[in-house]
Amino acid sequence: MRMTEISLAGRLPVDSYGPGGFRIEGAWQAGSLVLSPGGVHGFEPPVDAEALAPLVAQADAIDVVLIGQGAEIAPLAAPLREALEAAGIGVEVMSTASACRTYNVLLAEDRRVAAVLVAV
């Protein structure tokens, strides 16, 4: 089997997640985060229009946003989903653990992805 190393240069993979935060590119970030082509932004849960504003502003660089709602899956409010979809951004809601894994896979595939991650 041939192994190929994947380079995520210039991207922001989630190295790990744990109690109260995330390790992004080797640095611990406490709290809930928005990861986008424009960088890392913190926010206070729950996910609201203010947390999603940086994504809408970058809609031309994002095809899909993964929303990690914490330890359990919780629906995203319809007006928030509609605002993202109106901006041309697809939305997938899942647990934070699933969102972290899926985000990293999509980054490795060089997809135009962002993530909203509620800390667990």
Predicted segments, located by residue:
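Mid-chain, well-packed structural core segment of small domains
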Residues: 59-94
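A short, acidic, amphipathic alpha-helical segment used as a generic capping/interface helix at domain edges
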Residues: 48-59
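C-terminal structural segments of small proteins and small subunits
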Residues: 86, 90-118
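Non-catalytic interface/targeting segments
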Residues: 1-49, 108-120
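Short active-site-adjacent helix-start/loop capping segments
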Residues: 42-44, 73-76, 101-102
